């Protein structure tokens, strides 16, 4: 039984070494185990095999200021709550929003606000939200704020639109490319990256759907000091422009090494 448990854990939780977290100067710092999953441009593996992305860079800067050593752990997103409860990870820091989940976790204050829009193929003729009707299918990440608000019918989109939910951003992009759906709803950062890769194929709607706040999620029973410390440094990073500069580094066409959680 112990062997089986160990094997299952290995399949759902993988520690990847990070060059920025292995310096001699920080070897004695307390470790923050951060659960992440591939979600370009927030989290991905660059050409050197190291973690990169908006959330990775924000986490590294915040942890350095807070005197914490970040350890990024690749997880199966469906196992995130179990891994938190078991202590395999300390938090989730991967394009994750407290919207609809306020009471499910112990959250930091929001550190970033994203704009959500829709992308479609240029050849489809779909240019705006008004073009979405019952004949159209839209891709969203399963469990995302986009999915929940579409299902609730509280967006300015026809309630007849077909909603197709996928397990990751990569699957949403694949569905759009293969024509399984007509469009994809996600944060503008992800959509702009798609258009930057295929500028003659896709367009992002000029009209935006909503904004979504991001936070760092700890288990709801967490009683440590990390949240308080992170709130302090993230506030300072927002005030001094650090977070804005990090986001600007990943605007479409600036960084293209990504392989591409949710909004």
Task: Map each language-model feature to its residues.
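A ligand-binding cleft/hinge motif common to bilobed small-molecule-binding domains
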Residues: 79-82, 94-104, 149-152, 175-211
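Short, solvent-exposed loop/turn elements at domain surfaces
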Residues: 41-46, 101, 148, 225
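N-terminal hydrophobic or amphipathic helices and topogenic motifs
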Residues: 1-71, 242-263
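Bilobed "Venus flytrap"/periplasmic-binding protein-like clamshell domains
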Residues: 33, 37-41, 51-64, 120-170, ...
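Acidic, polar ligand-binding/catalytic clefts
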Residues: 56, 60, 64, 69-132, ...
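Ligand-binding clefts/hinges and TM-proximal coupling segments of bilobed small-molecule sensing domains
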Residues: 9-15, 71-72, 145-166, 199, ...
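Extended ligand-binding regions for polar small-molecule ligands
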Residues: 53-65, 123-126, 130-136, 140-145, ...
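Periplasmic-binding protein-like
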Residues: 37-38, 113-120, 188, 192-235, ...
């Amino acid at each position: 039984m112990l062997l089986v448990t160990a094997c299952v854990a290995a399949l759902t939780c993988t520690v990847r070494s990070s060059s920025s977290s292995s310096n001699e100067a920080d070897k004695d710092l307390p470790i923050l185990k951060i659960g992440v999953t591939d979600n370009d441009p927030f989290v991905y593996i660059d050409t050197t095999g190291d973690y990169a992305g908006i959330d990775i860079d924000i986490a590294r800067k915040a942890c350095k200021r807070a005197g914490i050593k970040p350890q990024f752990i690749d997880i199966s997103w469906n196992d995130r709550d179990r891994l938190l409860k078991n202590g395999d990870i300390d938090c989730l820091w991967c394009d994750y929003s407290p919207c609809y989940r306020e009471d499910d976790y112990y959250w930091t204050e929001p550190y970033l606000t994203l704009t959500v829009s829709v992308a479609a193929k240029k050849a489809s003729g779909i240019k705006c939200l008004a073009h979405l009707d019952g004949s159209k299918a839209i891709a969203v990440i399963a469990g995302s704020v986009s999915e929940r608000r579409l299902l609730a019918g509280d967006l300015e989109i026809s309630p007849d639109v077909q909603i197709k939910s996928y397990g990751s951003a990569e699957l949403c992009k694949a569905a759009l490319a293969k024509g399984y759906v007509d469009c994809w709803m996600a944060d503008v950062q992800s959509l702009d990256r798609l258009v930057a890769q295929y500028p003659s194929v896709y367009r992002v709607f000029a009209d935006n759907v909503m904004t979504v706040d991001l936070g760092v999620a700890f288990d709801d029973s967490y009683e440590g000091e990390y949240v308080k410390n992170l709130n302090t440094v993230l506030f300072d990073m927002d005030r001094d422009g650090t977070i804005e500069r990090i986001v600007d580094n990943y605007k479409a066409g600036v960084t293209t090494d990504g392989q591409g959680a949710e909004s």
